[in-house]
A protein has these predicted regions:
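Asp-based, Mg2+/Mn2+-dependent phosphohydrolase catalytic module
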Residues: 1-2, 125, 129, 139, ...
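A metal-dependent, Asp-based hydrolase signature
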Residues: 48-112
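Glycine-rich phosphate-binding "P-loop"
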Residues: 104-117, 190-197
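Phosphate/oxyanion-binding active-site loops and adjacent basic polyanion-contact surfaces
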Residues: 19-23, 120, 198-206
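Active-site neighborhood of HAD-like aspartate-dependent phosphohydrolases
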Residues: 1-47, 54-55
Length: 280
């Protein structure tokens, strides 16, 4: 029986908090230069605004056409966007929304993402090696080359040549965040107990990738692994796949509870559990 595994990478196989520190520092350095403020002042604002985001995790998220499509508290990359917006507001800088969005997302995010370090979660090598017998793909919102570089680094640390089979099975820029209300065969949203807003399900670009990788296999044979339920797992769960939430200290309580309670949901913190779930 063909078993398909769709694996997110950043934050799922890596320690997002540790690898994201250079991204965070570089982003704040650029904000200081752009606003003309002292770095110390920017750092103070960042600490204050980050605390606000973490204190009210339901209120902040990745906005797509004015709607939250992913929570912001989950990792330093997502947290930086509302923090940076608050810093620009406080400085009265880049007030135009189009200009601000291009600056924060298309320029500063992309440029500083390249500064990330390579810090893997415990047992990432063992977990990835165990997935070779399956039809395993890495599907990420990031660009392909940085993720391939991380896999090559993990290969060198774990066992050289262990992940050569994965070389051409990395798909980047998956647009998991792009929500469009045009897939009428799917519900528009999920309601998670404990979360006041809806989780938006109709993500056509991500769905087309999942459908292509699935081929003619039933959804029951597809397992999707990610660290953010709303971004990585909500859509495949609705489609009928099994989903694995690789939780961390910043995973929202409502995501943990919903996945743990669902018959096709699997909540883990040890990546070595993935193989057994695929073989269920």
């Amino acid at each position: 029986m063909r078993r398909i595994v769709v694996l997110d990478f950043d934050g799922t196989m890596t320690d997002a908090e540790a690898e994201g520190r250079p991204f965070w520092e570089g982003y704040l350095e650029d904000l200081a230069a752009l606003t003309g403020r002292e770095r110390r002042e920017i750092d103070e604002m960042a600490r204050r605004f980050e605390a606000e985001v973490l204190a009210s995790p339901q209120e902040y998220g990745w906005l797509w056409k004015g709607r939250i499509v992913c929570p912001a508290a989950v990792d330093p990359y997502q947290r930086m966007i509302p923090v940076a917006r608050k810093i620009l507001d406080a400085c009265g800088a880049f007030k135009g929304e189009d200009e601000r969005a291009r600056l924060l997302d298309a320029v500063l995010f992309k440029y500083n993402y390249r500064k990330t370090e390579r810090v893997f979660r415990p047992y990432a090598g063992e977990a990835l090696a165990s997935l070779e017998p399956f039809d395993t793909w890495v599907v990420t919102n990031a660009h392909v080359e940085p993720v391939k570089a991380k896999i090559a680094d993990l290969d060198a640390r774990y066992k050289r040549g262990a992940f050569s089979w994965l070389g051409e099975k990395v798909i980047g820029r998956a647009n998991k965040h792009v929500v469009e209300d045009r897939e009428l065969d799917l519900p528009a949203e999920l309601r998670l107990p404990g979360l006041a807003r809806p989780v938006l399900v109709r993500r056509p670009h991500y769905r087309s990738l999942l459908e292509r990788l699935r081929g003619d296999a039933p959804w029951e044979q597809v397992t999707v692994v990610g660290d953010i339920f709303e971004l990585d797992l909500a859509l495949p769960l609705v489609l009928g796949a099994h989903v694995v939430l690789a939780a961390n200290a910043f995973t929202p309580t409502w995501e943990r509870a919903y996945v743990a309670a669902h018959e096709r949901g699997h909540l883990i913190e040890d990546l070595r559990e993935i193989e057994g779930i695929v073989l269920r």
